[in-house]
């Protein structure tokens, strides 16, 4: 779609995605099909047009819609404009679009909306934060209770999210 390609070029300054969805039409579909507090799920988010449309619609009508974008980190072609611009996979393009679109929406607002949420959190599917530690009763010693069982590259936030998920607590 030429309109969608032009919209993305305006945001990034280059044609970095081959088949974006048109923002205008997606915004209209969401406006018709959702209420102001809906949750939108896009399992093939690509360049994150859906997230852009949700933020735009919230800015226009004061809604409180949320979005979940899901995208496999498909690598960008090394000869592509996206790769040359530093985007090694599609997820990076989507995240940057959400950042840029959010800033642009905020700048274009005639009256600042303090309640407008343009932030987002990135969650990645990964292995457990805990080391695989197995003891048989014969091997167990009380001193082993003090051993560090958290993988070295994990953050406190990683641990928090794992515990929340294990306990069935919602992440937002």
Locate predicted features:
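Short, basic, low-complexity termini and linkers enriched in Ser/Thr/Gly/Pro
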Residues: 107-118
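A phosphate-binding catalytic loop at a beta-strand-loop-alpha-helix junction
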Residues: 38-57
């Amino acid at each position: 779609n030429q309109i969608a390609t032009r919209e993305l070029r305006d945001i990034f300054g280059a044609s970095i995605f081959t088949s974006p969805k048109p923002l205008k039409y997606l915004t209209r579909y969401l406006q018709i099909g959702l209420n102001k507090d809906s949750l939108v799920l896009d399992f093939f988010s690509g360049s994150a047009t859906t997230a852009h449309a949700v933020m735009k619609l919230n800015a226009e009508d004061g809604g409180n819609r949320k979005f979940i974008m899901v995208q496999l980190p498909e690598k960008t072609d090394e000869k592509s404009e996206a790769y040359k611009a530093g985007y090694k996979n599609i997820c990076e393009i989507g995240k940057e679009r959400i950042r840029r679109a959010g800033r642009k929406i905020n700048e274009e607002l005639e009256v600042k909306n303090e309640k407008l949420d343009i932030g987002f959190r990135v969650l990645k599917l990964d292995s457990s934060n805990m080391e695989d530690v197995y003891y048989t009763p014969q091997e167990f010693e009380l001193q082993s209770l003090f051993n560090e069982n958290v993988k070295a590259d994990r953050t406190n936030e990683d641990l928090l999210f794992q515990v929340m998920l294990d306990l069935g607590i919602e992440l937002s």
